[in-house]
Design a protein with these regions (language model features):
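Domain-level signature for soluble enzymes in the chorismate/prephenate branch of the shikimate pathway
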Residues: 1-290
Length: 290
């Protein structure tokens, strides 16, 4: 049996994504909900769980900041991805809630900022660990408002005050991408399928045009960059007078593809300072493109 950890409590969007990812696994699975993304990452690293599911990217709010850093720090591998449509609703325990406090995950509050401004601009917004935790809190306290999925609100016995209240951008549906992570690579290369690979680059050199050099390597090897994220460096980088940065590149292709391998080798050569045997490029995993 494979144990899969994820952010709880039950009835979160992460829980829904976890169930969908678990259906792809041939072995029997047990799903365990934990209190934080840190707990999920550590549970896998410490062999308390075989795999974990973590929210990675929302198409309105962008990167879930701690996700990639936790994968990097705990030396985990991304083995799968699930894209989930996010449709947020507002629930309450009573009808008298015009100035009630609004509870939800910080990302959900941000994704509903326009609707909240129009209808509850004077209400205090209080962050919770998840959307389901917000629904649970309002149900137990019998006061306040919760932003969560309609399913979660109904399961906690709350009335729907507003449905599909998320911000709209160009009329597009909001999605969140979730990663399935493990201790080892688990996505075999199949030439008939399309993959994405996440690459972490920590330059131990600095010069004008450094980021352009990185992107030139992927272009030279005919690889398409889907996303690039800049974060404070997690490794000890001794570049005097600068705040060291690292880059996460999500690239179309599999880690075992010949073009990808040549690109990784080139990046390691160009980003590594002369005379120092240190890691500058790490492949965080390959996974099927949704």
């Amino acid at each position: 049996m494979k144990i899969i950890s994820h952010l709880g409590p039950k009835n979160t969007y992460t829980g829904q994504a976890t169930r969908m990812l678990a259906e792809r696994i041939e072995e029997e699975t047990e799903l365990v909900d934990l209190a934080s993304l840190e707990a999920v990452a550590r549970s896998v690293a410490l062999h308390e769980a075989d795999m974990g599911v973590m929210a990675y990217y929302n198409y309105l709010e962008g990167l879930v900041q701690e996700c990639l850093d936790l994968i990097y720090e705990n030396d985990l591998k991304i083995t799968g991805m699930q894209r989930l449509p996010i449709v947020l609703s507002l629930g309450a325990h009573s009808e008298n809630h015009s100035t009630a406090e609004v509870y939800s995950h910080p990302k959900a509050l941000a994704q509903c900022s326009g609707w909240l401004w129009d209808h509850y601009r004077d209400s205090k917004q209080i962050p919770t660990t998840s959307t389901a935790a917000a629904a649970q809190r309002v149900a137990e306290a019998k006061s306040g408002l919760a932003i969560a999925s309609s399913e979660a609100l109904k399961k906690y016995g709350l009335d729907l005050v507003g449905e599909d209240i998320g911000n709209k951008r160009y009329g597009r549906t909001n999605f969140t991408d979730f990663y399935l992570v493990a201790r080892e690579n688990g996505c075999a290369f199949d030439k008939t399928r399309e993959y994405l690979t996440m690459v972490a680059i920590t330059p131990h050199v600095d010069r004008p045009g450094l980021l352009a050099e990185i992107l030139q390597q992927t272009a030279y090897h005919n690889l398409n960059n889907v996303k690039i994220h800049s974060r404070p460096a997690l490794d000890d980088v001794a570049i005097e007078g600068l705040e060291p940065q690292m880059f996460y590149l999500e690239v179309v292709g599999h880690r075992n593809n010949d073009d990808m391998r040549r690109c990784i080798d080139s990046l390691r050569y160009k980003m590594k300072p002369e005379g120092r045997d240190i890691e500058v490029v790490r492949v965080l995993g390959s996974y099927e493109r949704p």
